[in-house]
């Protein structure tokens, strides 16, 4: 049986700031050795050449090494999943998942947060966008579920991943070995990597059957309702963090999910918050005061609707040559979500093909039932 989990959100006040993590460790909220995973937003451009993710990784790993007993190699295995780009009001921050100190919480038959993590097999450049990547990710998700003590996929509410994308060096490497890659457009490869990973999650959880090569990044009817996939240049495997609920674990946190049907779907956000356990709010709740400080964080994926319209109204995000649609839709959804939560420190990430319905995306909420 896994141990009870602490989930805490801390601000990032500058690009190399890890003081929030250090303060929690110093305060005895959890030990450095018990940190399982970190999911956060960094303030870079969110693109291929966003190195703020690497800076945050170094800063957080340094704290874990300094304040814990794990070796550098062991700390390197802790998933640190950073999504770059804090467009609009989105505020840089980190959500930290850690085992609670022994004896702090008693076991309970009520569902409480449990976390498992895994690293996939190495993802080769030629795997990205193809069935091999789907299979490798699916296998990793199953390992993470087992480590979380989850046997029923219905108890999984959030799967956060970080996977490699393509850069010119890895494209050249594949071609030197006689292999081909899905795309030579490195920015597009971010979307492709995320999309393929999401299908691996969906396969592992039984949401879909194994897709064909032709369906990857094309058949938008295939998606996972709990996948949140990011990609970057800093790794060559899939980092996989599975968050769900389990009975008998204990603790004070619970996770739930829903979907946003489009970029303006506040009801989808409220549905996720209620699904996580805050079901005492009015059905027509439209104000953050009803949350009463019990929401730890929201995690969302978003995508510009490929039709170029939202609720029938035309927009030009996909035609804008000055500001990439990635940044525009992220800022839009970040504002919508902040209006619901009353807090701009939400995890909002873009490139959401196969993550929720086309033009929408998954919404995951983690709540503190004792706040």
Curated annotation (Swiss-Prot):
GO biological process, one term: uracil catabolic process
Superkingdom of origin organism: Bacteria
Pathway linked to the protein: Pyrimidine metabolism; uracil degradation via oxidative pathway; malonate and urea from uracil: step 2/3
Keywords: Hydrolase, Magnesium, Metal-binding
Residues that bind substrate: 53, 83-84, 194, 230-231, 330, 349-350
Reaction catalyzed: barbiturate + H2O = 3-oxo-3-ureidopropanoate
Catalytic machinery residues: 162, 230
Span list, region RU A: 1-104
Site (Important for substrate specificity): 326
Region of interest called RU C, as start-end residue ranges on this chain: 253-371
Claim: Metal-binding is one of the keywords in the record: yes
EC top class, as a word: hydrolase
Similarity annotation: Belongs to the cyclic amide hydrolase (CyAH) family.
Role of this protein: Responsible for the hydrolysis of barbituric acid (2,4,6-trihydroxy-1,3-pyrimidine), an intermediate in the oxidative catabolism of pyrimidines. Catalyzes the hydrolytic opening of the pyrimidine ring of barbituric acid to yield ureidomalonic acid. Can also use cyanuric acid as a substrate, albeit with lower efficiency.
Self-association and partners: Homotetramer.
Domain description: The monomer structure is formed from three repeating units (RUs) that share the same structure as one another. The monomer and the active site possess nearly threefold rotational symmetry, to the extent that the active site possesses three potential Ser-Lys catalytic dyads, but one of the 3 active site surfaces varies in composition suggesting it is involved in conferring substrate specificity.
Annotated protein name in UniProt: Barbiturase 2
């Amino acid at each position: 049986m896994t141990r009870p989990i602490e989930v805490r959100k801390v601000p990032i006040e500058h690009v190399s700031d890890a003081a929030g993590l250090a303060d929690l460790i110093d305060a005895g909220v959890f030990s450095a050795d018990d940190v399982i995973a970190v999911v956060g937003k960094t303030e870079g451009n969110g693109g291929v050449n966003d190195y703020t993710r690497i800076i945050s990784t170094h800063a957080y790993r340094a704290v874990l090494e300094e304040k814990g007993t794990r070796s550098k190699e062991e700390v390197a295995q802790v998933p640190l999943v950073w999504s770059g780009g804090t467009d609009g009001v989105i505020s840089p921050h980190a959500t930290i998942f850690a085992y609670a100190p022994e004896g702090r919480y008693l076991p309970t038959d009520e569902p409480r947060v449990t976390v498992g993590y895994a690293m996939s097999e190495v993802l080769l450049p030629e795997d990205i966008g193809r069935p091999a990547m789907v299979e490798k990710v699916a296998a990793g998700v199953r390992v993470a579920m087992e480590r979380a003590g989850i046997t029923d996929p219905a108890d999984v509410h959030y799967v956060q991943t970080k996977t490699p994308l393509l850069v010119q060096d890895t494209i050249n490497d594949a071609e030197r070995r006689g292999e081909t890659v899905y795309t030579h457009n490195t920015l597009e490869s971010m979307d492709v990597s995320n999309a393929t990973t999401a299908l691996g999650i969906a396969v592992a959880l039984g949401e879909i059957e194994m897709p064909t090569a032709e369906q990857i990044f094309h058949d938008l009817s295939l998606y996972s309702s709990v996948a949140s996939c990011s990609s970057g240049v800093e790794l060559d495997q899939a980092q996989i963090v599975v968050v769900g609920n389990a009975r008998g674990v204990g603790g004070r946190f619970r996770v739930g999910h829903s979907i946003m049907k489009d970029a303006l779907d506040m009801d989808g956000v409220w549905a996720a918050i209620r699904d996580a356990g805050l079901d005492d709010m009015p059905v027509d709740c439209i104000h953050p005061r009803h949350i009463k400080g019990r929401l730890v964080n929201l995690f969302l994926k978003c995508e510009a609707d490929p039709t170029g319209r939202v609720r029938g109204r035309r927009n030009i995000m996909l035609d804008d040559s000055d500001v990439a649609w990635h940044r525009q839709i992220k800022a839009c959804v970040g504002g919508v979500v902040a209006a619901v939560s009353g807090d701009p420190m939400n995890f909002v990430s873009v490139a959401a093909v196969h993550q929720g319905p086309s033009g929408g995306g998954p919404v995951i909420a983690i709540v503190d039932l004792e706040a």
